[in-house]
Amino acid sequence: MVLTEMSLDYSNRVLGSQKDNVKQMDKEETQQKENMLFSSQEYAAKLQKENMTLMKALAHRNKLVELSGIEIQKLRINLRSVQEKNLQLAQANSQMLAELNTNRDRLKDLQHELGCKNALLKVKKHLEEQVLPRTHHESKDKVSASASDGDCKSFQVHDIKHKDTKRKRTTRIKSSVSADVKPIPVNDSNSKANRKRRVSGVIDTTGIPEEICQTEDDIDKGVVSRGVNQDIDNVVNKKFVPDAANPVKESVHRKRQCTRRQSTRFDVQETKQTEKLLEMDGAKESKETASFSLRRRSARLRHEEAEPCKSLHEGDEVRETIKRRRVSLRLSARFDIQEPHVTETSNADDARSIVIEESAGSRSESVEPSESRHETKEITRKRSFSTRRQSTKGKSQTDEAIKEIATDPSLVNTIVQECDQETESKDKPKADENEGMTRRSSVGRPSRHAAEKVQSYREVSLRVKMRRKC
């Protein structure tokens, strides 16, 4: 019984405890539910608040983006304007630099012109200091007389090239350029300008052009030296008219006239000697002597060209001259026919030395006294006489040799035939030789391969190389 009671009590206790536990559990659940309700409401409120803040941030960001886009557009517009301004400034800078360079060039040119003008003014002052007054009454009369005599023709000396192309001419005498002569109208203005010309101490005789006034009668007679002397006197009288107040000027005038007259006399005598030697020697010797004499003369002394003998192509006279020439050429070993060459070369050398001494004397007139001038005149006269004597000796010896040879009748027929063949063979290659001499600019030197024009620096292809005809 006791056990049952005790079991009943225990079961009751257990049941009571279980009931208490269930009640507690229910209470806890209800509390949790209440807590959950409060927490969800709060959480929703929090979420709403956060959403509002985010919306505000988005709106602010959009505003910032719009503002930044507007600023970017403004900056782009400013950049374009700055670039345009930069281009304008660059163009202006380039224009300014170009103007600066042109102005510098103009400044250099103006400085050069200013220097030239200053030099010209100095020279003008120097010339005005050294001006000597002149009178041109006599020169006017002489110019009018020479203009009324006949038309003046300029004589242009043609350079005759020698056969020996290796020989080169090394003369220091400058050739004066011949100019066409026109009748000079004498006016008061020209006379005033001529009065102010400078009488330099160094007298340039090469400045006067070689003018030959020839009429038909003078050409037929061969009188050329008179026209030359008249024209030279006219030019000298134009430039240097003696003045009573200036003894130095008178001495210069006399010295110049003497040198001119001596040079023209010597030139005429030399041409006569060359004509006589041409009649005696063969065609080869005639060519050599003419070229030799014309080479050695200065350009202001040359006023005649060596003319070939016209009697070579006329009938019986041709045969006689051919006989004499051929015989003289064959028997040059027996008779000393080389003397005319020697005399002629000596004449040419003497002429050259006389010309050089005369030019040197004319240059040193401003320094040397009058005694040295007279001595130079005497020396030139003695040399001209010695050259004349040598030429007459050579002429007499060659004439005697020709007379002795011309008497032999056995050589006549062979000489005539051979000379006819020689004249024909000589006349043919004349034009060819002249053309060959004019074509050749440099003798004995082939054209260099490196001096040719390069068409392209590109390497030639193999096919083109193989096609070459080497």
Swiss-Prot record:
This is SHUGOSHIN 2. Pfam families: Shugoshin_C (PF07557). It comes from the Eukaryota. Keywords: Chromosome partition, Coiled coil. Residues 163-172, 382-392 have a biased composition (Basic residues). It comes from Arabidopsis thaliana. The gene is SGO2. Residues 72-113 form a coiled coil. GO terms for biological process: maintenance of meiotic sister chromatid cohesion; meiotic sister chromatid segregation. Dispensable for both meiotic and mitotic cell cycle progression. Required with SGO1 for full protection of centromeric cohesion during anaphase I. Required to prevent precocious release of pericentromeric cohesins during meiosis. Acts redundantly to SGO1. The keyword Nucleotide-binding does not apply. Shugoshin is Japanese for guardian spirit. Knock-down mutants show no meiotic or vegetative defects and no reduced fertility. Sgo1 and sgo2 double mutants are almost completely sterile and show a premature separation of sister chromatids at anaphase I. Residues 131-143, 150-162, 370-381, 396-406, 423-438, 449-462 have a biased composition (Basic and acidic residues). Residues 131-176, 358-470 are annotated as: Disordered. Belongs to the shugoshin family. GO terms for cellular component: chromosome, centromeric region; nucleus.
